[in-house]
Amino acid sequence: MRAITTHTGSWDVDPFCPCARNRKERYQMNSCLDAFSTTFDAFTPMLNFHEQQDAQTEWRSCRVNSQTVAPLDASSPLSYSSFAGKCSQEAVDDTKTGLGLAMGLYDGYYLIRDTAYKSLLDRAKISGSALPKLSRTVLAAVLNECLHLHSAEALLLLREGKISAVHSGDAVDYSVLPISELLGTLKTKLDARFPGNIFLAGYTDHAITSASWQLPAQREDLLGTYAKLLAANGKATMAGRLTPGVRFITSDTGVASAKVSALLTGDQHPIHIGSCVAVDHRHQSKIADFESAMDQLFAQFGDAVSKLQALMEVHLDYPVNAMTRVCKKLSMPKKAADEAIAMFEMAYGDNPATAHDVFMAMQEIPYILKTEHTPESKLLIVEENMARAMSLRWSEYDRARAVS
């Protein structure tokens, strides 16, 4: 897949025209491509981007058995003319070298984005690791045989000339929560409850959107007790540089709920310490539900810090073994985890440590991945998984026996 250049400023052309290009400097917006991603260094451009994207997004209802999947590869009879007016030649070529599938609807064929693959299988009610190994012709035939068995409603997300998701059409199973409205609601709530908040960074690709803020004015309220404990345990330098923050994540392709998590910023990489607010895209959820949930952010942030603080009381006799087992339990990327474990072992040797020491040492993992240019979406998943370490029963991992 081609590398996609990202954008961090304002747009000088419509970024939502098929594969539109920003002609300023070196930036190139190939927003129709599956591998597209972009970053933002200010909130307003990010909000503007999603407002325009939401305005040009189509949500279309149809019956599952009315969908027909077609192969799109070198041997496919479909060509650019089959998608006339819906996408660019570049988007067609991108799909041919990627997922290699298209869908026929009442008004013609649409490309299927890779983000739609899982939800398409869900509508067909099939799964299996062998499916991606099939030729596109065989895979399309299998999908059609299964799709045509089901008369339930589906809700298609059409964006940038491709089908980006094939959700259930039942409002109990999937509720649309426009990203621009979530962002606007979040900013209003942050300004009201956390005045002085500072936007740090934003990220968007076709699967996930995230944004993070720092909350410097609430440092004493949120981290005061924790910072004092750090200082009392010889970690005054760490205590002095940490500042509370929050990260927002959402997805309209089925990857994530609309959630806000607690962060500690100021270190080499933000430390994710747990989810505070989460509203699923289910059960007829509305933006108002997210707005109401945000009222609990301050209290939930305090609970997350208390959990982190409690790790300082969990003493480990075999911290290197414990770290190794916890990383395995949480499915941390092995190469980065091994490197972080080796660094921790060099620092602590055979000496005892606390679960807090190990948790902080694990923060090297996302930093290592970041330096290796790991995609942002994968980093977010790693950080969320790592935060689960705060709720583990550490005694189960603190064993003398070497890890196999």
Positions of predicted regions on the chain:
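Extreme N-terminal basic, low-complexity initiation segments
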Residues: I4-T5
